[in-house]
């Protein structure tokens, strides 16, 4: 029988220790045999980079939605909530003040359980496919950096995302990982996106209008940059606090330079973090090329498809802790709640921040991590 563990030494179950003993040895050898991020400018201390300390981490979640997403955000919050983490909820400016007020009332009504949850009162206008989406994400990051002092990874989720395992299992596995790893899907092989994303110049009216509209296209086109290399990937990320401090503060000016460049870039949220992390020597070796999501992809139309009950088995076998995109109140969400999350209609369980009780789901995530950090995948897929 597995035992719950708390954030003190030697509090993990014996099976977990035996399995992860080999895993940690591999990570330690891998870390020492490769160039580690510099601690001179990145703010990463050497002892922070080793996976020898199995303390429970903290996640900082940014959960975003738009008009009509209040109900979905509430359900998602309930599914991912753990008292050890931090949560920032944002309904963009297209949502009404009443929707934001209703969300804030919901959080206040469960104040004892949701004391680690914040709701953004001053909403951002977010244009689909525009850089205002990136600006809003950076806004959320800045708030979490200011309000929450001790988190380890930032994870962004939209109202159409949903977890595939309890937070206890994710926290359990991440407690064994080096705290410098950035989970971000990325590639420099952009193919057709060069002509449709990199060369066009767009203007996002969301920066200066109060009502949502589409982006404007300029007649001129631009060449590819020469001073940095473009990378693209998923908008979903799990990024470390030190890396995001670098993005916000930008002490070597790369993050600011790239932010200016991506102001006129279509779907800049699919390239900004990827390009920053892969063009900085202190962080390019910290990437794990995965966005921690299961996604059903349509290769012909180049878009994600809605996940249904038919995809349930594939979702589970993927080992991913999250999935996208779900229709509101789809039957598969109920199936996930019952079979994977163990949720009931009795409400939120009052948990203790320093206690983690993993279920059997951690084994699925462990398999995914071992595969991602295998020597044939890890370094070979970093910033290529």
UniProtKB/Swiss-Prot annotation:
GO cellular component: Golgi membrane
Location(s) in or outside the cell: Golgi apparatus membrane
Glycosylated residues (UniProt): 156, 285, 306
InterPro entries: GLCAT14A/B/C, Glyco_trans_14
Record Pfam families: Branch
Cytoplasmic face of the membrane: 1-11
Residue intervals passing through the bilayer: 12-34
Annotated membrane topology: Single-pass type II membrane protein
Class of the enzyme per the UniProt entry, highest EC level: transferase
The entry's keywords: Glycoprotein, Glycosyltransferase, Golgi apparatus, Membrane, Signal-anchor, Transferase, Transmembrane, Transmembrane helix
A molecular function GO annotation: glucuronosyltransferase activity
Lumenal face of the membrane: 35-384
Enzyme nomenclature, EC number: 2.4.1.-
Major subcellular location class: Golgi
PANTHER family according to UniProt: BETA-GLUCURONOSYLTRANSFERASE GLCAT14C, GLYCOSYLTRANSFERASE
Family, similarity comment: Belongs to the glycosyltransferase 14 family.
Function as written in the Swiss-Prot or TrEMBL entry: Beta-glucuronosyltransferase involved in the biosynthesis of type II arabinogalactan (AG). Modifies both the beta-1,6-linked galactan and beta-1,3-linked galactan present in type II AG.
Name of this chain's protein: Beta-glucuronosyltransferase GlcAT14C
